[in-house]
């Protein structure tokens, strides 16, 4: 047993307060090069925001058929226009792919508390929400017995019954160029989106003061090399899945903007590049 341990052992140096990870010599070399060359994502003048938590998706996230029904129930052109502006397309984590997304024709009734909407100005939306029962939509945390069935309201907040659970103060960011990525993923998938698109709480998105850098970030973050590196930082779920915690994502080292291959930018040797290329 002792001979086996000596033959299979790997020397690792744990010199920082970061999480410990056991790597082979070639993996240690690759990790050091990435960290010595790249600038942590947090220093690229970017912002990471979390997707929207409604507290009751059945009421607030609707398909195109229901959206059209709500719009058809509007009593005036003015109400229809205002309502169409309130209902926005939304992505889920499962919709995010590498360099793109598959929109599932879902829409969000975006009654963010920070927007201070008057629900009386949206009668068709109000009627739709009330069809689920006001007690169910209240944000009181209370329990009710209705027709012999226990109904639990959404968790207690200071928000109104028709509003989403989270306040969401970054409404304008959904209208900017952004990078979407899922909260839990089998492999790192980032996609740039320049259209108006919202996302739910299984998704994060990145905005940048200079939107031009988003394409560079998308290119880097979608590589096998960065996928491998991220797994040395984050906690793995099951065999392959990882959680995209911002504390780790913000520390991914990104090289300067260039058209050169990423392995070249990080200064990887030929054998190190082959090692990454041969990963499953």
Predicted regions and their residues:
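Polybasic, glycine- and aromatic-enriched phosphate-binding surface used to engage nucleic acids
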Residues: 5-6, 11-254
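Conserved beta strand-loop-helix elements of the APE1-like EEP
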Residues: 1
């Amino acid at each position: 047993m002792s001979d086996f341990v000596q033959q299979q052992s790997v020397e690792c140096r744990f010199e920082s307060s970061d999480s410990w990870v056991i790597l082979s010599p070639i993996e240690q070399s690759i990790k050091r090069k990435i960290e010595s060359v790249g600038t942590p994502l947090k220093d690229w003048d970017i912002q990471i925001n979390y997707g929207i938590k409604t507290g009751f998706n059945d009421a607030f996230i609707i398909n195109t058929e229901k959206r059209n029904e709500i719009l058809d129930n509007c009593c005036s052109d003015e109400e229809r226009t205002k309502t169409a502006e309130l209902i926005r397309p939304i992505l889920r984590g499962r919709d995010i792919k590498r360099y793109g997304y598959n929109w599932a024709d879902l829409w969000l009734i975006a009654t963010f508390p920070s927007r201070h909407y008057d629900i009386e100005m949206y009668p068709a939306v109000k009627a739709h929400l009330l069809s689920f029962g006001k007690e169910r939509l209240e944000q009181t945390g209370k329990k009710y017995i209705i027709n012999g069935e226990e109904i639990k309201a959404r968790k207690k907040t200071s928000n109104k019954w028709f509003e989403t659970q989270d306040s969401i103060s970054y409404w304008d960011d959904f209208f900017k160029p952004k990078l979407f990525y899922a909260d839990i993923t089998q492999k790192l998938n980032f996609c740039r989106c320049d259209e108006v698109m919202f996302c739910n709480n299984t998704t994060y998105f990145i905005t940048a003061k200079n939107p031009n850098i988003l394409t560079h970030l998308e290119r880097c973050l979608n590589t096998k090399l960065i996928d491998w590196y991220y797994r040395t930082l984050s906690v793995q779920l099951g065999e392959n899945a990882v959680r995209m915690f911002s504390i780790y994502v913000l520390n991914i080292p990104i090289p300067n903007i260039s058209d050169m291959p990423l392995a070249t930018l990080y200064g990887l040797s030929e054998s190190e590049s082959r090692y990454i290329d041969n990963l499953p």
